[in-house]
């Protein structure tokens, strides 16, 4: 292993932005690793993720989906006009910004899929980014994702370019998607999609690069190479990571780049993929891998096992197998059983950090 990524970063701990995000992704490409992007929905899932990255001595991406951001605000808040998703996203960002330095690792603060119908959510967060930028010289979020993969390619590229123009003065990263990722994710259902549209064409990657590069270097592309969101059995999905290799070679040749990997790729719909598929995709320039479904299951499993094991101590506030007057507070205190979910989720994040070669990269 070469020089650790901390040597490259101006901010060593906490939420990183701008050139530091670029340096992190460049370091990832050069050293054949990717950073897992964990969807967080609560303070509890945030700390489970931060703890795993700290213990594995590596960076992490924490991301909020539109639904996850609304959940952060509370299910009792109306989401008319995306107000809960905007308020929850901002609250989560401030929470992560204030807490992340305590874990001593660099963190990329990101928002996940934003389809066309959810653009008012992204607009509201960008308003807040610009306000924060005026005060602090950096945006609130390190990066955002715009997902117009269901729209015509020209509209996708033009609209993404317009958003990158808005983000560029803040040196804010923008992730975009081209080609469809199958399955179901917040607000986007592509379960019945024709298989061929799961594979992005190299001409599209080049068109994106040509449109976005003159605006800003701070962008990445989630390309379809057979990926599917959600839960599926290994072998049911035909992934073709080698397409990413072809895309890189095509773009390199067409733009005359001296880099073998001129494009920063993102791997979506990764739950259930094999370690070999991850490693192959990473070798072709994938710098970020979205992981959500597996983490949700891991979080639940710790709480499930605790509840099943402690069932006789959770039926009443007082009274258990040790005596009808024995209190159960130590068993039903949320800090006890929620922590069980954090522990199992944290363990699962650690597995991802190993699988993607992220562990030890500081």
Swiss-Prot record:
Protein name per UniProt: Fructose-bisphosphate aldolase
Active-site residues, as the UniProt record annotates them: 112
Organism the protein comes from: Aspergillus oryzae (strain ATCC 42149 / RIB 40) (Yellow koji mold)
Associated pathway: Carbohydrate degradation; glycolysis; D-glyceraldehyde 3-phosphate and glycerone phosphate from D-glucose: step 4/4
Claim: Metal-binding is one of the keywords in the record: yes
Lineage of the species this protein comes from: Eukaryota, Fungi, Dikarya, Ascomycota, Pezizomycotina
Enzyme class: lyase
Residues binding D-glyceraldehyde 3-phosphate: 65
Family recorded in the similarity comment: Belongs to the class II fructose-bisphosphate aldolase family.
């Amino acid at each position: 292993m070469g020089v650790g990524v901390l040597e490259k970063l101006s901010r060593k701990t906490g939420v990183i932005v701008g050139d530091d995000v670029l340096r992190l992704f460049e370091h990832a490409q050069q050293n054949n690793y990717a950073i897992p992007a964990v969807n967080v929905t609560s303070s509890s899932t945030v700390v489970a993720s931060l703890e795993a990255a700290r213990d594995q001595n590596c960076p992490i991406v924490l991301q909020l989906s539109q639904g996850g951001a609304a959940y952060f605000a509370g299910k009792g808040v109306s989401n008319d006009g995306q107000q809960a998703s905007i308020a929850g996203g901002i609250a989560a960002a401030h929470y992560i910004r204030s807490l992340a330095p305590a874990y001593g690792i660099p963190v990329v603060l990101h928002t996940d899929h934003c389809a066309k119908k959810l653009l008012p959510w992204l607009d509201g967060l960008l308003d807040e980014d610009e306000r924060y930028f005026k005060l602090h010289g950096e945006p609130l979020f390190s990066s955002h994702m715009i997902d117009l993969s269901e729209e015509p390619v020209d509209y996708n590229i033009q609209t993404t370019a317009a958003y990158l123009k808005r983000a560029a003065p803040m040196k804010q990263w923008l992730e975009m998607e081209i080609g469809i990722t199958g399955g179901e994710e917040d607000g986007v259902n592509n379960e019945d999609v024709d298989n061929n549209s799961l594979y992005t064409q190299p001409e599209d990657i080049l068109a994106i690069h040509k449109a976005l590069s003159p605006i800003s270097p701070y962008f990445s592309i989630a390309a379809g190479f057979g990926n599917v969101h959600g839960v599926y059995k290994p072998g049911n999905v035909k992934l073709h990571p080698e397409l990413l290799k072809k895309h890189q070679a095509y773009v390199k040749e067409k733009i005359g780049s001296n880099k073998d990997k001129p494009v920063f790729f993102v791997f979506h719909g990764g739950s259930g993929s094999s370690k070999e598929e991850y490693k192959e995709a990473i070798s072709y320039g994938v710098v970020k891998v979205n992981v959500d479904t597996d983490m949700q299951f891991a979080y639940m499993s710790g709480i499930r096992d605790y509840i099943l094991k402690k069932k006789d101590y959770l039926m009443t506030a007082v009274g258990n197998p040790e005596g009808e007057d024995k209190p159960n507070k130590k068993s039903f205190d949320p800090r006890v059983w929620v922590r069980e979910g954090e522990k199992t989720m944290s363990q699962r994040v650690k597995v991802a950090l190993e699988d993607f070669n992220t562990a030890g990269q500081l």
